[in-house]
């Protein structure tokens, strides 16, 4: 009985306590409601908390910006710009270099990194036409208010720590011509909002964390350059790839697999293509023989099978060909080695059984780890016998042709090209990519119309990733494109150190010399009357992608995205950026040579990966093509990669002659290690025996990369961004593409983000810290001593990466560029191991100037 009584009493006590607590809470809440006891600090704290989680209808973050009534603005557009920039300033969590310190007051045109110019539709009023915060090491996110910058033509924020997604209200930026978000920490699926930008020509999303499939509309859009390498994109490429009018496309270091679309042969304007470091597992389509303008062709480090199509002999502009680390077999067609401009042919780590003698006379070639009789460093007889015992490969079984669905009334899939995108190639309905196995020979002829004359096709001289034999045998991807220096990137601005540009002050970087003939973009672009928006000429900062530590060093470099001819951005007052040189669009595809179907090779057995060429870097760097900035007017930074030019003469400069100070780059050989930064547009010289002589580091202007001759001596790298240092020489960027800029768009002398000052290059950790984290500590300087090249005729170790000087938009002081001594081709002797202090390795072979500096991880 006592126990029962105690239990009842206990239950009663709990009930009474609950009732007491309930009524106490209600009374306290009522007292707060009626008496308003919250202090101002408490109210402010609650407001900030609410704003932190505020989202618009798209889920984008916004900020609460109050405009002081006492502020006076020249016009409503500058008032909107004030709201947008103040919201962005609130969204910045860390600004270690004080780029946004002077973002105060109504004079937004004096803000650091902000450039104004006359509006296209009303020349009597000023508006914000360009933003350049490259290499600022800023952490934060992009608020939705940036959609208020409706007159913006250039938006460059590479090499920062921005995270999150791209705001949906970016679709209001109807005049945006160049978008460079590279080397940040953006994540999520492909930012489809960029497909709604009608004037967009240059898209650079490299070195982020984007994932998922790539939308078909991307290849139906009228772009000139696509750089999506070093992300996490997956799945197969859409079969309408050939509809794209781009001159440069880099999808390296992702997770693509499946077929190489046969429509690839329809890309009539294509000059550089880098598909390395993926998982493509089909045959090379014979239709690639139609690509008459391609200078750099890199499909290394995939799982491609079959034989090399004899139609490759029709790619008459080819300079760099890299198919290493695949499962190719059969005999190499003699027509390939007889290409008139071929400087480097790398086909190591395959299962080829025949090699024509003419290939041995190429300036640079690598045939190691094959099954070639009477050649050194081949696979073991057991490996070759095991591979030859496999059944032959039937290339038709992959079903890599375009979807052959009959023109039923089936509505085209929602993958219709986004506004402004180039129409899909004719005769092919934009039906979802069906994997109907059509013979690869069925590429639809209707390649997407070439992008307007503004297409800054990188000079054909860009070296292919293949490295010349002179350098060590390691097939590191660092081969830099040997593009002749004649392609000074238009408006390439000298790379200025990442120091925050003082408002209105031009960065200390040497003045960017306008690329020869640099003219404002031709009016072919949709923008209304050109506004002279002074955007800093974006010289190709080392676009080199940070080396992926785990990936084997591919012999071919990844081309850094050449910044398309900067849209005519209004010239910022006082800025002496070199005029952007519109490179003439490349001629349409020459009549496609009849593609010969690749011989069915034996079924590819997993390639036996021989030891990667002696690449010194512990982590195999993925070759990245870094667009060298225009050499004009800037002291060339020493090329980070010792890309010794092959014996053949340097490719003739495209329509542009390189700045007088730069001699034409001789064909360069790939050095085993990819240098992190792209070499400046300077003539590249074969590495001289003495390693002590480093080439001078050129200053990069972010926008269009000018051809960079390779200096053998190791340059110092300025930024630390890439994860694992790559040892690989990036080829010189091709001559500056001749861009016809959008007609009315303002001529921006846009200095695209120059590479950061010589920061110490430490491989960035794979995982990015939370976007909120403050500026990361500077990476430790790492001195890599690449081993000397093993045998001549192989990769020569790249020279130390060049020191990049980032040039902020204002005209940098004139820098005296002393050209390095004429290239001495020492095939056997590699340049001294470069000291890798810079950021991500450049993507060799790309003549584009928009350089995403390596991210600071």
UniProtKB/Swiss-Prot annotation:
Its main location: secreted. It is found in: Secreted, Cell wall. Keywords: Cell wall, Cell wall biogenesis/degradation, Glycoprotein, Hydroxylation, Leucine-rich repeat, Repeat, Secreted, Signal. One of its GO terms (cellular component) is plasmodesma. Expressed in roots, leaves and flowers. LRR repeats lie at residues 32-53, 125-149, 150-172, 174-197, 198-221, 223-244, 246-267, 268-291, 292-315, 316-339, 341-362. One of its GO terms (molecular function) is structural constituent of cell wall. GO terms for biological process: cell wall organization. Glycans are attached at residues 98, 293, 344. Residues 1-31 form the signal peptide. Residues 615-857 are annotated as: Contains the Ser-Pro(4) repeats. Residues 406-776, 817-839 are annotated as: Disordered. The keyword Glycoprotein applies. Residues 408-571, 579-768 have a biased composition (Pro residues). The keyword Manganese does not apply. Hydroxylated on proline residues in the S-P-P-P-P repeat. O-glycosylated on hydroxyprolines. Modulates cell morphogenesis by regulating cell wall formation and assembly, and/or growth polarization. This is Leucine-rich repeat extensin-like protein 5. It comes from Arabidopsis thaliana (Mouse-ear cress). The lineage of its organism: Eukaryota, Viridiplantae, Streptophyta, Embryophyta, Tracheophyta. The gene is LRX5.
């Amino acid at each position: 009985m006592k126990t029962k009584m105690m239990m009842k009493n206990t239950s009663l006590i709990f009930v009474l306590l609950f009732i007491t607590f309930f009524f106490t809470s209600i009374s306290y809440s009522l007292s707060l409601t009626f008496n308003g006891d919250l202090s101002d600090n408490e109210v402010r704290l609650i407001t900030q908390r609410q704003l932190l989680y505020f989202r618009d209808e798209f889920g984008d973050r916004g900020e609460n910006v109050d405009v002081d009534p006492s502020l006076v603005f020249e016009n409503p557009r500058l008032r909107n710009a004030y709201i947008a920039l103040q919201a962005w300033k609130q969204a910045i969590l860390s600004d270690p270099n004080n780029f946004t310190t002077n973002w105060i007051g109504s004079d937004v045109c004096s803000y650091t990194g902000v450039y104004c110019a006359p509006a296209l539709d009303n020349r009597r009023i000023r508006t914000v036409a360009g933003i350049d915060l490259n290499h600022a090491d800023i952490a934060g996110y992009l608020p939705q208010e940036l959609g208020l910058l409706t007159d913006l033509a250039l938006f460059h924020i590479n090499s920062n720590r921005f995270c999150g997604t791209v705001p949906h209200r970016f679709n209001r930026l109807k005049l945006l011509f160049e978008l460079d978000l590279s080397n940040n920490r953006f994540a999520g699926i492909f930012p489809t909002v960029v497909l709604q930008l009608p004037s967009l020509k240059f898209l650079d999303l490299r070195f982020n964390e984007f994932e998922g499939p790539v939308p078909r509309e991307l290849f139906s859009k009228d772009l000139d350059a696509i750089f999506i390498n070093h992300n996490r994109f997956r799945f197969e490429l859409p079969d309408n790839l050939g509809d794209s009018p781009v001159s440069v496309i880099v999808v390296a270091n992702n997770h693509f697999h499946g077929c190489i679309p046969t429509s690839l042969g329809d890309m009539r304007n294509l000059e550089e293509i880098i598909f390395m470091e993926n998982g493509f597992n089909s045959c090379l389509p014979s239709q690639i023989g139609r690509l008459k303008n391609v200078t750099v062709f890199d499909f290394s480090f995939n799982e491609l099978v079959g034989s090399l199509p004899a139609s490759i002999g029709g790619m008459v502009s080819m300079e760099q060909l890299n198919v290493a680390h695949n499962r190719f077999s059969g005999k190499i067609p003699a027509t390939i080695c007889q290409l008139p401009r071929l400087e480097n042919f790398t086909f190591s780590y395959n299962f080829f059984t025949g090699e024509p003698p003419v290939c041995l006379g190429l300036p640079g070639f690598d045939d190691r780890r094959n099954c070639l009789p009477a050649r050194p460093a081949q696979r073991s007889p057991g490996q070759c016998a095991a591979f030859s015992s496999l059944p032959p490969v039937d290339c038709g079984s992959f079903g890599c042709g375009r979807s052959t669905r009959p023109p039923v009334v089936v509505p085209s899939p929602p993958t219709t090209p986004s506004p402004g995108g180039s129409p899909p190639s004719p005769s092919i309905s934009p039906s979802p990519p069906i994997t109907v196995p059509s013979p690869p020979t069925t590429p639809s002829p209707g390649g997407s119309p070439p992008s307007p004359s503004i297409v800054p096709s990188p000079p054909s001289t860009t070296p292919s990733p293949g490295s010349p034999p002179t350098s060590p045998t390691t097939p590191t991807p660092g081969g830099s494109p040997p593009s002749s220096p004649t392609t000074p990137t238009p408006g390439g601005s000298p790379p200025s150190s990442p120091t925050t540009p003082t408002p209105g002050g031009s960065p200390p970087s040497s003045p960017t010399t306008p690329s020869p003939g640099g003219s404002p973009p031709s009016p072919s672009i949709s923008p209304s009357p050109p506004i002279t928006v002074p955007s800093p000429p974006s010289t190709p900062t080392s676009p080199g992608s940070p080396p992926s530590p785990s990936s084997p060093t591919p012999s071919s470099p990844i081309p850094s995205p050449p910044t398309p001819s900067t849209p005519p951005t209004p010239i910022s007052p006082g800025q002496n950026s070199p005029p952007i040189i519109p490179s003439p669009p490349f001629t349409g595809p020459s009549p496609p040579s009849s593609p010969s179907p690749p011989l069915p090779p034996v079924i590819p057995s997993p390639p036996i990966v021989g030891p990667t060429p002696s690449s010194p870097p512990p982590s195999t760097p993925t070759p990245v093509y870094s667009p060298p900035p225009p050499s004009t007017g800037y002291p060339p930074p020493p090329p980070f990669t010792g890309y010794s030019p092959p014996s053949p003469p340097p490719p003739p400069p495209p329509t542009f002659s390189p700045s007088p100070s730069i001699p034409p780059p001789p064909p360069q050989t790939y050095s085993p290690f990819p240098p992190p930064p792209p070499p400046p547009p300077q003539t590249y010289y074969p590495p001289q025996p003495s390693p002590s002589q480093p080439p001078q580091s050129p200053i990069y202007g972010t926008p269009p990369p000018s051809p960079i001759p390779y200096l053998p001596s190791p340059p110092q790298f300025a930024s630390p961004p890439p994860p694992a240092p790559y040892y690989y020489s990036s080829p010189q960027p091709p001559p500056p593409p001749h861009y016809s800029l959008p007609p009315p768009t303002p001529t921006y002398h846009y200095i695209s983000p120059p590479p950061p000052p010589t920061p110490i290059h430490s491989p960035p950790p794979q995982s990015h810290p939370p976007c909120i984290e403050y500026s990361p500590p500077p990476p430790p300087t790492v001195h890599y001593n690449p081993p000397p090249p093993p045998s001549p005729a192989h990769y020569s170790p790249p020279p130390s990466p060049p020191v990049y000087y980032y040039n902020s938009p204002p005209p940098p002081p004139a820098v005296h560029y002393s050209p390095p001594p004429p290239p001495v081709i020492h095939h056997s002797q590699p340049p001294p191991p470069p000291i890798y202090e810079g950021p991500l390795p450049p993507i060799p072979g790309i003549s584009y100037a928009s350089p995403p500096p390596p991210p600071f991880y």
